[in-house]
């Protein structure tokens, strides 16, 4: 998904970090004080852990990874530093740890109810049909922590960050080689609505090479 451009991963992770910080601070909060760590998040379609290691371990105490390919998660776990994998039984001095390693496809994963501050989905939902995506998002919605009244920065959400179709008529683009779909912004919004979700923040990723599809990030909560 990074298109062979080595600088793209850094640009992507920085954009995601900035988006998440703005989302957690909320419109009314301009303080530069550091935010408390999130308790538990999920990295879905985690692969070898680029987002887990490059972003989520820095903002959360526990990161569960959901990835169907076991050799990818084995590589992820082997690449972690001392104390970064809860399965080793070591603490990590207040820093984030990888918690559960779940080798399932998104369509088969049922999140623990009310467990997660953030469920992060990036470059993975294109392998789900529209119907599967709606059901999956509904399950993710049930997996979010319930918000405590008045705790604006602790509001949980689903994050979806994906390539967008560039079709002038907003049609989805299908790739027969890997059986994936690149959806239009219009279709994403329709599917989010079908799943009972509202968009609370969204922006285009800046700085990506023009040769690649545009990338948009959405933060979603129950409508």
Predicted regions: what is each one?
Residues 124:
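Hydrophobic adenine-recognition pocket in adenosine-nucleotide-binding enzymes
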Residues 1-114, 128-141, 148-223:
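Class I (Rossmann-like) S-adenosyl-L-methionine-dependent methyltransferase catalytic domain
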Residues 120:
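A conserved beta-strand element that flanks and buttresses the S-adenosyl-L-methionine
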